Swiss-Prot record:
Gene3D superfamilies referenced in this protein's UniProt entry, alphabetically: DNA helicase RuvA subunit, C-terminal domain, Vaccinia Virus protein VP39
Top EC class for this record: transferase
Protein name: Release factor glutamine methyltransferase
Gene name per UniProt: prmC
HAMAP family in the record: RF_methyltr_PrmC (MF_02126)
Family: Belongs to the protein N5-glutamine methyltransferase family. PrmC subfamily.
Endpoints of the signal sequence: none
Entry function: Methylates the class 1 translation termination release factors RF1/PrfA and RF2/PrfB on the glutamine residue of the universally conserved GGQ motif.
Entry keyword set: Methyltransferase, S-adenosyl-L-methionine, Transferase
EC numbers, comma separated: 2.1.1.297
BP GO terms, sorted: methylation; translational termination
InterPro entries for this protein: DNA_methylase_N6_adenine_CS, HemK-like, N5-glutamine_MTase, PrmC_N, RF_methyltr_PrmC, SAM-dependent_MTases_sf, Small_mtfrase_dom
Recorded superkingdom: Bacteria
């Protein structure tokens, strides 16, 4: 172990699990400081310039404050692409990539798609890149999120149309006929806050995370209602869901006159995706 990795591990060992510290050490050295991975593996001692030393100290300081490494780097990997992220948007999760993969697999001929609550734009842009003949629209209520999404759209050479839209307002919502509506809306209840890590609670946007305990399905219910207006006959809904509400979601979606409702487990064996046909 060289002095740099030893310094990183010593600085973070009381905050992060050993395996995460090891992964962070490699990420910081190779990706953020430009150190050759082979030199790390061989234990070669590395001398950083004064500028790189200050950069390292800043990274460590921010990690000690529980800031997610993705925000420190300024981007996160999702579906094989790097997306800009900042505290105004959620950090993309692997479970959400499963949602994108499922949509692409099941709907290769889809032509019109809508992503509601787009955040960084990771779902919408990934669908646009993987379904090149499709036209993708994306909504969010947050101007901060939309600014980041539009930047990702430009940098990744995608053609998504982004718009500020409050789903609980009828203003601006017209009867466009979509093949697919997808959403990963807020679904963490206030009670579940106690189970969350500090790097999520302290840094990621509450607007994109939490729903009231007394109405955890409020966003899904409203989007299902919109789907009756905006989906063509035979169009599909795709949701990322809270694992605790799979059966409640099925009942609510069926009450909204959708058919072929399915709940699909994620890579961790938890109910995570719901699909339904109009």
């Amino acid at each position: 172990m060289n002095r740099i990795t030893a310094y990183i591990r010593q600085s973070l060992q009381d905050i992060y699990p050993p395996e995460e510290v090891k992964a962070l050490s490699m990420l910081i050295c190779c990706d953020m400081l430009g150190v050759d991975a082979l030199d790390i593996y061989m234990g070669k001692d590395i001398i950083l310039s004064a500028c790189k030393q200050r950069e390292l100290e800043n990274i460590i300081f921010r990690l000690q404050k529980n800031e997610p490494i993705q925000y420190i780097r300024g981007y996160a990997e999702f579906c094989g692409r790097n997306f800009r992220v900042a505290p105004g948007v959620l950090i993309p999760r692997p479970e959400t990539a499963e949602l994108v993969d499922l949509i692409v697999k099941e709907n290769p001929d889809a032509r019109r798609l809508l992503d509601i609550g787009t955040g960084s734009g990771c779902i919408a842009i990934s669908l646009d890149k993987n379904l090149p003949d499709a036209k993708v629209d994306a909504w969010d209520i947050s101007e901060e999120a939309l600014a980041i999404a539009r930047k990702n759209n430009e940098e990744l050479d995608a053609q998504v149309t982004f718009r500020r839209q409050d789903v609980f307002s009828a203003d601006g919502i017209q009867g466009t006929s979509y093949d697919i509506i997808v959403s990963n809306p807020p679904y963490v209840t206030e009670t579940e806050k106690t189970e969350m890590e500090a790097n999520v609670l302290d840094w990621e946007p509450e607007l994109a995370l939490f729903v009231p305990d007394e109405d955890p399905l409020r966003f899904y219910r409203r989007i299902a209602e919109l789907g009756r207006e905006l989906l063509r006959p035979g169009g599909k809904l795709y949701f990322e869901i809270n694992q605790a509400y799979g059966q409640d979601m099925i009942r609510m979606i069926e009450m909204n006159q959708y058919r072929d409702v399915r709940v699909i487990k994620d890579i961790f064996g938890k109910d995570r995706i719901l699909t339904a046909n109009r």
